[in-house]
């Protein structure tokens, strides 16, 4: 179920602090975060946020259609390399 409207969106305080500082200074440097659970807000549009996927930080350029989604949705954690080919059938 989606989050209740009366609760509002959730964003970690340390991430919001970094975004406010980047908006005030106009910095273009990616904002590194481990907070996959934070929701994308309109203040983040145009920023590059490096979201941790468990192994490395994946750069995510935030656009207007991402607002309302979680940051973790844009940094996949699993890599699928395919099933091994069946050598008997040849």
From Swiss-Prot:
GO terms for biological process: ribosomal small subunit assembly; translation. NCBIfam families: rpsS_bact. InterPro entries: Ribosomal_uS19, Ribosomal_uS19_bac-type, Ribosomal_uS19_CS, Ribosomal_uS19_SF. Belongs to the universal ribosomal protein uS19 family. One of its GO terms (molecular function) is structural constituent of ribosome. PROSITE patterns: RIBOSOMAL_S19. This is Small ribosomal subunit protein uS19. It holds the Pfam family Ribosomal_S19. The lineage of its organism: Bacteria, Pseudomonadati, Pseudomonadota, Gammaproteobacteria, Methylococcales. Keywords: Ribonucleoprotein, Ribosomal protein, RNA-binding, rRNA-binding. GO terms for cellular component: cytoplasm; small ribosomal subunit.
């Amino acid at each position: 179920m989606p989050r209740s409207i009366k609760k509002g969106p959730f964003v970690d305080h340390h991430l919001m602090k970094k975004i406010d500082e980047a908006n005030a200074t106009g910095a273009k440097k990616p904002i590194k975060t481990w907070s996959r659970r934070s929701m994308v807000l309109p203040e983040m549009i145009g920023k590059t946020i490096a979201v941790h996927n468990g192994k490395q930080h994946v750069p995510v350029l935030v656009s207007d259609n991402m607002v309302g989604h979680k940051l973790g949705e844009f940094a996949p954690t699993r890599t699928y390399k395919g099933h091994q080919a069946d050598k008997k059938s040849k």
